[in-house]
Amino acid sequence: MTVPVLRTLSALRSATREWHLAGETIGVVPTMGALHDGHLSLVAAAKSACDRVIVTIFVNPKQFNKASDLASYPRTEEDDARKLARFDVDAVYAPDVSQIYPEGFCTNVSVAGMTDVLCGAHRPGHFDGVATVVTKLFTQTSADKAFFGEKDFQQLMVVQRMARDLDIPIEVVGCPTIREEDGLAMSSRNLLLSDRARTMAPRMHEIMQEAATALGQGAPFDALQATALRQLTAAGFTDVDYFELRSCASLSLLDHASVPARLFAAAWLAGVRLIDNIDVPVAR
């Protein structure tokens, strides 16, 4: 099966109008392409929950802080289409920039508070770019449900808050992080890792797991954080952006796992920024 690739908003709306008139529900999986099994798990979740599924592929320039980062982002549309054909996806929406940000576009969607920490603190404007493009994709697709991975947990929370605050009639569904056999969280950026860096990358997850186990046993976070930072440096990671314990509900900083919490980490390895987060058991 060949998946229809829609390039224009008019083509997209023609399809979604027909589906809604037939009483069918629509699920959307927003991506920037370079699809891996993590993305495909979102597609599978959408297929099980909705009558029709749209996968969007759009490398959003507004969420990149560096032009070089945007230029180097993997683009593999033909391979992506082959992968999606196996899932009987109803449409791929792959617009060019003019369909998302037409000439004169001057609106910015910003979610205050939770975008000032973690990745937001190190990538100024990143989540404004995310919130803006996702708002556009939600309104353009008229989807009933949207599927995001917990691997980008902060992004998931930002999108859920944005949809709630703006009364967008869509359910934002979070899906579990999918990992490689060695524990590395699947990410399109993993394609940028050298062979040597790829063998080093899983150490971040191992360090996080060790800290999470100790937190669940009641250990205070400050000593664990200091140890983790030393371990990451020893493992070859540079410029650790953060290694923090935060509330699942509000992203507020915690010093003990006294409430539902997650560990968040971001660090650079051989020029590639890797991020991860894991659930932490409430301390006994």
From Swiss-Prot:
Catalytic activity reported: (R)-pantoate + beta-alanine + ATP = (R)-pantothenate + AMP + diphosphate + H(+)
Pfam families given in the database record: Pantoate_ligase (PF02569)
Active-site residues per Swiss-Prot or TrEMBL entry: H39 (proton donor)
Functional pathway: Cofactor biosynthesis; (R)-pantothenate biosynthesis; (R)-pantothenate from (R)-pantoate and beta-alanine: step 1/1
Subcellular location field: Cytoplasm
Keywords attached to this entry: ATP-binding, Cytoplasm, Ligase, Nucleotide-binding, Pantothenate biosynthesis
Binding-site list for beta-alanine: Q63
InterPro entries: Cyt_trans-like, Pantoate_ligase, Pantoate_ligase_C, Rossmann-like_a/b/a_fold
Binding site for (R)-pantoate: Q63, Q155
GO molecular function: ATP binding; pantoate-beta-alanine ligase activity
EC number annotated for this UniProt entry: 6.3.2.1
Gene Ontology BP term (one): pantothenate biosynthetic process
Residues noted as binding ATP in the record, renumbered to the chain: 32-39, 149-152, 178, 186-189
CC per GO annotation: cytosol
Keyword ATP-binding: yes
Presence of the UniProt keyword Transport in the record: no
Quaternary structure (record): Homodimer.
Note: The reaction proceeds by a bi uni uni bi ping pong mechanism.
Similarity field: Belongs to the pantothenate synthetase family.
Role according to the record: Catalyzes the condensation of pantoate with beta-alanine in an ATP-dependent reaction via a pantoyl-adenylate intermediate.
The name this protein goes by in its record: Pantothenate synthetase
Organism: Roseobacter denitrificans (strain ATCC 33942 / OCh 114) (Erythrobacter sp. (strain OCh 114))
Originating gene: panC
